[in-house]
């Protein structure tokens, strides 16, 4: 399966279930979507253009067993990312799981490009020129997730080794570090 490691973990978690509903936020080129569907999951996608719009969750139903975002929550300001996380939490069923990546302050791109705010920088060149990226330290990311989720695991990974060129058109990432988060929605947030 040429899918992101978090997509693989999601499939392993939901293995054996058929027609289980999964929300994929910012589905990119569809690599993860294909892997999820091949596993028999019923996938609703929010494409990249919609994810970047003013109302990315308009028309998205609720009741999903899991949500996956392997790059959509890297983009925007911390406030934008927090809003997306809240909207995802509202769309998960009881015990629904979030599998997502977030930018780390250890990423080589942190502090590079145009400063949007203390935690957000827009790339000055390359595939993502002008695209704002939010970066978090562990405490900031825990604070962002805690109102909505019980964190199961939160690990930093070298994205160069995990994603490489398949996730970025022109060249592999260089010095990219992402948080991989797996979390269960809190009952009070549904």
Segments the model singles out, each with a brief description of its role:
Residues 82-94:
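A short glycine-rich, Lys/Arg-flanked "PGG" loop and its adjoining helix->strand segment in the class I
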Residues 65-80:
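A short SAM/SAH-binding and catalytic strip from SAM-dependent methyltransferases
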């Amino acid at each position: 399966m040429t899918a992101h490691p978090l997509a693989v973990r999601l499939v392993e978690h939901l293995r054996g279930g058929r027609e289980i509903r999964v929300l994929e936020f910012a589905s990119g080129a569809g690599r993860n979507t294909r892997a999820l569907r091949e596993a028999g999951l019923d996938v609703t996608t929010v494409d990249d253009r919609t994810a970047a719009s003013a109302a990315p969750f308009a028309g998205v139903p609720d009741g999903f067993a899991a949500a996956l975002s392997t790059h959509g929550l890297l983009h925007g300001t911390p406030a934008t990312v927090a809003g997306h996380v809240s909207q995802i939490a509202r769309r998960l069923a009881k015990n629904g799981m979030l599998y997502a990546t977030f930018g780390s302050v250890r990423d080589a791109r942190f502090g590079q490009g145009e400063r949007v705010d203390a935690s957000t920088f827009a790339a000055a060149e390359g595939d993502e020129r002008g695209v704002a990226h939010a970066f978090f330290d562990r405490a900031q990311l825990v604070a962002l997730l805690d109102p909505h989720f019980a964190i199961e695991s939160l690990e930093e990974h070298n994205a160069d080794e995990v994603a490489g060129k398949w996730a970025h058109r022109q060249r592999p990432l260089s010095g990219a570090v992402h948080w991989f988060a797996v979390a269960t929605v809190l009952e009070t947030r549904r």
